[in-house]
Structures are given as C-alpha cells and as structure tokens.
Amino acid sequence: MLQTWAKLAYEANLGIVYGSTLIILLLPLIGSFMPPNLVSSISKLNAFTLLESYLLPVLSNFGIFGGLALGVGSAIAFSVLNSIASSFLNLSFNQQQALTIVVALLVSQFIFGGWATFALFLTSMLGSVPPVPGLAVIMSFITPFIDGLIATLGGLMVVLSILYELSEIGLVTLP
C-alpha cells in the first residue's frame, strides 16, 4: 500500500520539480513579464537566499543565456557529485541513477524552490483575483492555509519519493 502511494508521490513530485526548475531557469526570460515583487519572492524561496539574491539579478542581465548558464552549471554539479558518490560507494548503474534522482529531488527543493515555487504561483494567482467586496477578507484567510498545506504535502511527497527510489534499488523495503 505504501509502495503505491510512494510511487504516485514520486511521479507527482517529479512533475513539480521539473516545472519549478523550468520556471526558475526561465525566470531571467519571463521576469520581464512578471511583477518585480513576484520575481524577488521566487528568488527568496530557498535555502541559498544569499547566493541567489546576487546570482539571479546578475543572470537576469543576460536573459535566456543566464538561465541556460544556471541549468548547465546545475547539470555539471549533479554529474560531478554523482561520479564522486559512485566511486566512493561502488554503486551499480541502477543505484547511480536512483542516487542521482534522490540528490536532484533534494537539491531542487532547496535551490529551485520546488513545491514552494508552486505554492507561490498558486497563492499569487489567488491574490490577483479582482477585488470583490468581502472576497479579499476571505482570501486573506484562505491563502496562508493553502500555502501551508502545499508546503506540508510537498515535504511529505519528497520523503515518499525518496523512499520509493530507495526501495527501487533495494535499500529499503516498503509494505
């Protein structure tokens, strides 16, 4: 039963990770179409706020090339980390792939925001509803709840995704 839920969480989480990573990589390009406060909010969603508060503005000066540089840099970093881990741990090819996905899931949550980026876009869309008497008050209560719910579910799905990957390579047995 847990195996089935973990697989569903894994597949959903990969979609969110790829989507939010794509948003961040294209942020220098689409930043001109978004309000500046939304762009700055996205860049402050993760653990590396200090790095990205300097990195994203510099990359945005180069437009799409800045996004590509960030993507290529991330890919090189994943490749180097994977080869180092594989040589130390003496892993098979399938285990290397699983380790890469686990590392990518974790790193994407911190560097690219992952579920936090999704929550920000959802709550900003809810916040941009045309002002209707009484609706603004309701939205001010609902938006933080939705944000917290998405963050909690996102964290749970990341854990389930990692458990699923570890079970696929035989390190963990799920019921």
Swiss-Prot record:
Tagged with keyword Membrane: yes
Subcellular location per the Swiss-Prot or TrEMBL entry: Host membrane
GO annotations of cellular component type: host cell membrane; membrane
Annotated keywords: Host membrane, Membrane, Transmembrane, Transmembrane helix
Transmembrane segments: 14-34, 58-78, 101-121, 142-162
Entry keyword Transmembrane: yes
Topology relative to the membrane: Multi-pass membrane protein
Name of the protein in its database record: Putative transmembrane protein ORF175
